[in-house]
Design a protein with these regions (language model features):
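Nuclease-adjacent, charged terminal/linker segments that flank catalytic cores
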Residues: 1-87, 294-322
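Non-catalytic C-terminal interaction segments of nucleic acid-processing enzymes
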Residues: 174, 178, 182, 191-322
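Leucine-rich, amphipathic alpha-helical/linker segments
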Residues: 76-108
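Active-site metal-binding core of divalent-cation-utilizing nuclease and nuclease-like domains
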Residues: 89-96, 104, 115-166, 172-179
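Short secondary-structure capping/junction motifs at helix and strand boundaries
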Residues: 41, 110-118
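Short, charged/polar micro-motifs that form catalytic or ligand-binding hotspots
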Residues: 5, 16-19, 23, 88-92, ...
Length: 322
């Protein structure tokens, strides 16, 4: 229930990958919770027949239980039903399910019934877009202005003594590559390198290749000051984001492509001692007002840099120093 309270919606397969030994066992348990009103389920109907996989959200009883645990006023039955209706018809629902699927692919390595993990690692922080924005968006950037960083998610992957923190940008192919690339401007203006690497999960290898080539043109040789890695979701083994599916961006779009595991990407961000998590997959999450974390968000003089392409109002040609 806590995962649904935090991440709003998960599919049958995603829930099964986290806690159950089989999809069938998950379906039986979910059906029982749905009958009790703890969970709510819905599906998409396809134009030419058939339906989507079941999507689950908190039912009214589940919402009341979460409210009681948090010592807050529970929603009314009408208000909760309206929320579920909005969720079911959310224009970005496919995107949200994709983001949650990415993190579930990592969190599944901690499934106690999984015996073929091989010690790949575990997810120790999983923040959704809302929580990430609350923490990162409103803080000052490197130039003293507001840093408009709004990742689709933020996480920490730990394996073999390494802790790779990351911001996730999840691409469904609906945005132009220029819009996607422009997001790097916000990360460049923020203290991104103090908190993690920047991951782009592209929906196809062809789009990944075009995106990487576009970065060379858009950045114009400028170092954004951010470690960037990309992957494509149609690659072999891409259903496991912890696997050898990541390629670091080096400023060039040619040469052999080397795929790395998530654990072998550069480590960025603070080391946080594990603690009793407020939410699942939060052992290494930042604590409010943490004295070791807050100084990382303090404004500092921006180091001199060459103009980047995003400095131009048109976003096409970078300004040049006199």
């Amino acid at each position: 229930m806590w995962l649904l309270a935090e991440h709003q919606v998960l599919t049958t397969g995603q829930i099964a990958s986290l806690e159950f030994s089989s999809r069938r066992r998950a379906q039986d348990r979910l059906a029982r919770l749905r009958s009790l009103g703890v969970l709510f389920a819905f599906r998409d109907s396809y134009m030419f027949g058939g339906t989507s996989e079941a999507r689950y959200a908190l039912g009214y009883i589940g919402a009341r239980m979460i409210a009681a645990a948090r010592a807050v006023t529970p929603p009314t039955a009408k208000a909760h039903m309206q929320r579920l209706e909005r969720l079911a018809f959310l224009p970005t629902l496919t995107h949200q399910l994709g983001v949650n699927g990415f993190f579930c692919g990592l969190a599944a390595h901690s499934n106690p019934t999984r015996t073929d993990d091989g010690g790949a690692g575990r997810l120790t922080q999983w923040w959704p877009e809302r929580r990430s924005a609350e923490f990162f968006w409103t803080n000052q950037g490197t130039d003293g202005g507001e840093a408009r960083v709004r990742p689709d998610g933020y996480g920490c992957w730990e394996s073999g003594g390494r802790a790779v923190r990351f911001f996730l940008e999840y691409d469904t192919g609906t945005e132009s590559l220029r819009v996607l690339a422009r997001k790097i401007a916000a990360y460049s203006a923020f203290y991104t390198d103090r908190f993690g690497v920047l991951l782009f999960s592209l929906h196809s290898a062809r789009r990944e290749q075009a995106f990487r080539a576009g970065l060379v043109k858009f950045l114009g040789g400028h170092d954004p000051g951010v470690v960037i890695a990309t992957t494509a979701r149609d690659l072999p083994g891409a259903d496991d984001p912890a696997g050898e599916v990541w390629t670091l961006w080096s400023g060039r779009d040619h040469g052999p492509v080397t795929r790395l595991t998530l654990a072998n990407l550069p480590e960025r961000g603070p080391r946080v001692s594990h603690h009793a998590p407020e939410l699942p997959y939060g052992e290494a999450a930042f604590q409010p007002g943490d004295k070791a974390i807050m100084p990382l968000l303090a404004a500092a003089p921006a180091p001199p840099r060459e103009p980047a392409w995003w400095d131009s109002p048109s976003g096409l040609t970078p300004r040049r120093s006199a």
